Swiss-Prot record:
Gene name of the encoded protein: rplV
Name the UniProt record assigns to this protein: Large ribosomal subunit protein uL22
GO molecular function: rRNA binding; structural constituent of ribosome
GO cellular component, one term: cytosolic large ribosomal subunit
GO biological process, alphabetically ordered: translation
Amino acid sequence: MQVLIKRNGMKRSKFHRERKEKLATMPVYEARAVAKFVRISPRKARSVANSIKGKNVSEAFTILEFSPKKAARLIKNVLKSAVANAVNNHGLNEENLYVYTCYVNDGPRMKRIWPRGRGSADIIQKRMSHITVIVRDKEAEKAAKEEK
């Protein structure tokens, strides 16, 4: 039988509290950043996102800097934010960081009407994206694996 603990009007189980305490003591070796509702088609952004997966952060910045695509500029800003989160919030070393994953999900679509001949109309869908970049520290990841 679960023991329910009432806190701030919400019921939480004992196991929930234990899991939360365990997660608080675990070492953090990854950071993430998300840009939501970005005005670019996910299909166009995914090719750029796939090009930086698994690369060192400095190498990924170089790839994005010299890419002529609009998505490269947007993903570069998200990557910069993820690196800042890793350094400032988690105290990770910037030289050891690499792009663990980078993915682009669909956002909502704005629907616009395009007038056509003979009084008809087409619907134009202006797409949005949610861009997520997760960076990890190679050294901290290795140390965590060795402890297990």
